[in-house]
């Protein structure tokens, strides 16, 4: 929601040294004093904001709840030549692999065993949570897709035509205006409950 903010305080250990980012409420005795925390989302979703690069742009909302039963999610790409939505990138080096598998989001079967089944992996709390799906890469249709395509042998200039970087460095409204890049659709079916 645009009127909500998200901030965190956390500790982590690196090289045997413990670091703290922000302040914990439990460390304070005076509850009327402000806490210093790390902002992850503010009310202004603008690329010029300092936290823009920290935002989770690999998260897509499906609905209020999503149940594993009958969950099927795929990524489709609209072909420039036919206008048809394809489950693969139409380049020789990668056309035998579905987009969802190329993006690393189809590694498991329906029983969460290592064997892709052609659909987005449903792992409660990890890839699917609170009606949202989480792709494994921060920019699945941007720089991460470019890196994956080039690693599979797609020439750099050719890979660039499939990349939608504007989805990650512009607002959603601005990115939707770029019809020549807005060619990906999440399609599928799921059951939800309230």
Model-predicted regions and their roles:
Residues 1-194:
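Surface-exposed, low-hydrophobicity segments enriched in Gly/Pro/acidic/Ser residues
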């Amino acid at each position: 929601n645009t009127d909500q903010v998200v901030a965190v305080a956390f500790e982590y250990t690196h090289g045997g040294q413990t670091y703290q980012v922000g302040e914990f409420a439990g460390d304070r005795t005076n509850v009327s004093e402000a806490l210093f925390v790390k902002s992850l989302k503010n009310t202004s979703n603008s690329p010029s904001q300092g936290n823009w690069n920290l935002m989770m742009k690999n998260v897509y909302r499906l609905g209020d709840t999503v149940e594993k039963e009958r969950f099927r999610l795929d990524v489709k790409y609209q072909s420039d030549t036919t206008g048809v939505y394809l489950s693969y990138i139409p380049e020789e080096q990668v056309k035998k692999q579905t987009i969802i598998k190329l993006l690393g989001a189809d590694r498991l079967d329906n029983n969460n065993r290592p064997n892709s089944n052609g659909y987005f992996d449903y792992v409660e709390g990890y890839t699917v949570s609170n009606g949202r799906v989480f792709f494994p890469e921060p920019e699945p249709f941007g720089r991460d897709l470019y890196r994956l395509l080039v690693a599979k042998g797609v020439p750099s200039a050719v890979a660039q035509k499939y990349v939608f970087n504007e989805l990650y460095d512009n607002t959603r409204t601005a990115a939707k205006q770029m019809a020549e890049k807005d060619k990906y659709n999440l399609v599928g079916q799921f059951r939800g409950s309230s």
